[in-house]
């Protein structure tokens, strides 16, 4: 992981570190290396473990949307992450063009799980977030929220707004420098 750590040196972290709903960077393990359902059971927030209403087969049907390039290798870094407070009560279908116009990228299912693994406090009661970069060909969008005090991976319809659900985004993804591997 050392090459990824070194690539954090040039990140602009001025002023954003204390911003609510923000993380400067996280490490994401590619989906070929970790099972999403199992990963949710490893998430812990306020001494309660995460869970998924989707089984592994359903989770594995969700793939990155067109235009989203996931770096090769076992792991990569996601930078400048925002949980989408400005998109609360905006449908995922309406939030996606807004995120893209801001030169940001929506998060994938795996990236969302990684985010709440590193920063479980970013997932709050009545303040979850959609993961717009993972779709499976139907109208569902995966999302993370608190249910019964526990982190939950589920889905919502792409055309429905929720007052408690925003759409997470990032400033970019960075893979390992050429010649490095994990």
Where are these regions (language model features)?
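A binding-site-centric feature that preferentially detects glycan-recognition modules on secreted/surface proteins
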Residues: 1-105, 109-182
């Amino acid at each position: 992981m050392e090459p990824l750590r070194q690539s954090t040196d040039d990140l602009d972290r001025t002023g954003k570190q204390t911003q609510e709903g923000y993380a400067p960077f996280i490490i994401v393990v590619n989906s070929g290396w970790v099972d999403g359902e199992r990963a949710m059971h490893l998430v812990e927030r306020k001494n309660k473990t995460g869970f998924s209403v989707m089984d592994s087969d359903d989770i594995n049907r969700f793939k990155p949307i067109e235009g989203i390039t996931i770096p090769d290798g076992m792991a990569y870094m996601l930078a400048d992450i925002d949980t989408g407070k400005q998109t609360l009560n905006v449908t995922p279908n309406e939030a996606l063009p807004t995120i893209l116009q801001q030169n940001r990228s929506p998060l994938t299912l795996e990236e969302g799980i990684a985010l709440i693994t590193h920063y479980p406090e970013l997932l709050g009661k009545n303040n979850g977030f959609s993961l717009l970069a993972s779709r499976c060909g139907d109208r569902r969008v995966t999302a993370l929220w608190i249910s019964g005090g526990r982190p939950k991976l589920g889905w919502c319809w792409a055309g429905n707004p929720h007052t408690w659900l925003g759409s997470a985004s990032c400033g970019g993804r960075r893979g390992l420098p050429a010649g490095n591997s994990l």
